[in-house]
């Protein structure tokens, strides 16, 4: 007899299984095209990608359709838009798609700003700006590959990230590669290993051919 698991909680949609688009104005309970999630003993963190923000709940909510406790990337739960609705990239997001909490720090793949944002502690206050980033020279910069050629310290549409065996892995989608740092950096630093390309300066589809080692 098949086993059908039921969700413990539902968040975002107005009803379980609801498919309607959220209201035009975002709230602390609504989600629009979420693409990334993280859960540990302290936080539930969701990339609310379509609203260009990160929502955080303190632990697993105790009821359905619960309001988030913290919002990052927007001035309030009612604001939306890339780069905080035009405020600027220093404290704004453009399509966040991946999230990891490691050693008390929050890492977010800010895909269309071509960077990984880092908070040195998981914020418990809304609209807290990130402390630094990987993939750009500063929090004000948003050009793909830092506005120059592909390199070990540049990113183009980083859609996913993970910490595995103490090493940071980033899916650098636009450059058709995976970058790996030997450890988890505490400042902007070049990657140590590349998968899917022959070297750190290449970004061709399938390395220009098709095979097992290609991305």
Regions found by a protein language model. Give the residues of each.
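Short loop/turn segments immediately following the C-termini of beta-strands
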Residues: 49-50, 59, 111-112, 121, ...
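Short coil/turn segments that connect the beta-strands within blades of beta-propeller domains
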Residues: 42, 103-104, 165-166
């Amino acid at each position: 007899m098949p086993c059908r698991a039921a969700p413990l909680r539902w968040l975002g949609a107005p009803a379980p299984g609801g498919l309607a688009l959220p209201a035009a104005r975002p709230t602390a309970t609504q989600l629009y095209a979420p693409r990334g999630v993280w859960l540990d003993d302290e936080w539930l963190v969701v990339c609310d990608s379509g609203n260009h923000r990160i929502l955080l709940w303190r632990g697993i909510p105790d009821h359905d359709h619960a309001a988030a406790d913290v919002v990052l990337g927007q001035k309030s739960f009612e604001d939306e838009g890339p780069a905080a609705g035009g405020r600027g990239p220093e404290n704004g997001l453009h399509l966040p798609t991946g999230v990891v909490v490691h050693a008390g720090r929050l890492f977010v793949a800010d895909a269309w700003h071509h960077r990984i944002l880092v908070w040195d502690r998981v914020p418990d206050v809304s609209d807290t700006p990130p402390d630094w980033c990987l993939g750009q020279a500063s929090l004000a910069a948003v050009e793909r590959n830092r506005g120059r050629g592909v390199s070990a310290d540049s990113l183009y549409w980083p859609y996913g990230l993970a910490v595995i065996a103490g090493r940071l892995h980033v899916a650098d989608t636009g450059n058709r590669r995976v970058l790996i740092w030997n450890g988890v950096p505490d400042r902007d630093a070049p990657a140590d290993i590349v998968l899917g390309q022959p070297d750190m300066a290449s970004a061709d589809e399938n390395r220009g051919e098709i095979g097992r080692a290609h991305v």
